Amino acid sequence: MQVSVENTSALERRMTIAVPAERVENEVNKRLQQTAKRAKVAGFRPGKVPMSVIRQRFEADARQEAFGDLVQASFYEAIVEQKLNPAGAPAVEPKSFEKGKDLEFVAIFEVFPEFAVAGLESISVERLSAEVTDADLDNMLEVLRKQNVRFEAVERAAEKDDQVNIDFVGKIDGEAFAGGSAKGTQLVLGSGRMIPGFEDGLVGAKAGEERVVNVTFPEDYQNLDLAGKAAEFTITVNSVSAPQLPELNEEFFAQFGIKESTLEGFRAEVRKNMERELRQAIKTKVKNQVMDGLLAANPIEVPKALLENEVNRLRVQAVQQFGGNIKPEQLPAELFEEQAKRRVVLGLIVAEVVKQFELKPDEGKVREMIEEMASAYQEPEQVIAWYLKNDQQMNEVRSVVLEEQVVDTVLQKATVTDKSVSYEEAVKPAQAPAEAE
């Protein structure tokens, strides 16, 4: 078999393969012999059809099948021989497939980029440290109470944080506009749900009162037909309700699946959850900085095939997340290209770090991660047992652990600065999530 390879770009290869005619004819004859055993031809018993008849009737099909199998087999042999690592399926261009002659075809494909991870010493990471204080815990308990607030009707003027039930009609230049009217709307004053000025205009209003509130739609309002325009809303207040925060009692604790009957026990459980969230937030922020550093220090070209595959994956995820009757392929590719490129490049870099430093998942850390995740459930031992008997889930955990080991490896060479911050600052969402596939 003859093979020649042309580099048509940094990652694209044009490989010409010639398979000897003898091998081609052997493959064709093999298929004809198999066909002869089962072919049903009028006038002949099964298995007794002369080969000349078999060849006359079935040679074209046998040759086409042989072509497909030989292209696949010889392409694999060629990339092994040439030590190439394709990043996707090849585009095949037949050149010659005449009887008695060599089978010749061209395979065009991309290869994975070859590179060594560099610049680890140039990466700078700020590693946060924080603790959950009693004040943080008190704030969290208030948040939990507000999330479970109930509203009770009151006979007084509406205040901030009250809930009002309203009917309203909005007009622009004296004309009602689409989407500007509603009846029986529940609105918490100060929630920021309505455009600026709308909620403020209802503070002090009482049930049964009608108010006229003048507002201006923001310049960046999502409905461009309304953006920047002045509007007048006539609002009728049907009722005013004041927030009633639940008591910190056993009934309240049970809403969170916590069996503790005392406030001290509940606080301990909430603190444990906050500490788990804190550890994860700090770990995520460190990981993001490491991944950003790896990207900056290792600019590599991305195979188009990998990028297209990742874009398609993100399209499917978007449809699954947001629903609707849209098909994934209807979503514009450019919406996902930047994220897809980041994920693909990080995946390649992380894989290379694993290879360079000969990393393997630490089974002890795998067990620790499973126990950490299980601790968030009421029956952690059952969760641990479920993971241990589920190979797919175990492999997913191993992948996460291996990625953490990559981060640890980089941190050993990077410049790391420790910084003590508050709980709130530490758990504040990171600006750009790191993603490696």
Swiss-Prot record:
Name of the top EC class for this enzyme: isomerase
Is Chaperone among this UniProt entry's keywords? yes
What Gene Ontology molecular-function terms does this entry list? peptidyl-prolyl cis-trans isomerase activity; protein folding chaperone; ribosome binding
Q: Which reaction does it catalyse?
A: [protein]-peptidylproline (omega=180) = [protein]-peptidylproline (omega=0)
Sorted keywords for this record are:
Cell cycle, Cell division, Chaperone, Cytoplasm, Isomerase, Rotamase
Q: Which PANTHER family match?
A: TRIGGER FACTOR CHAPERONE AND PEPTIDYL-PROLYL CIS/TRANS ISOMERASE (PTHR30560), TRIGGER FACTOR-LIKE PROTEIN TIG, CHLOROPLASTIC (PTHR30560:SF3)
Can you say what this protein is called?
Trigger factor
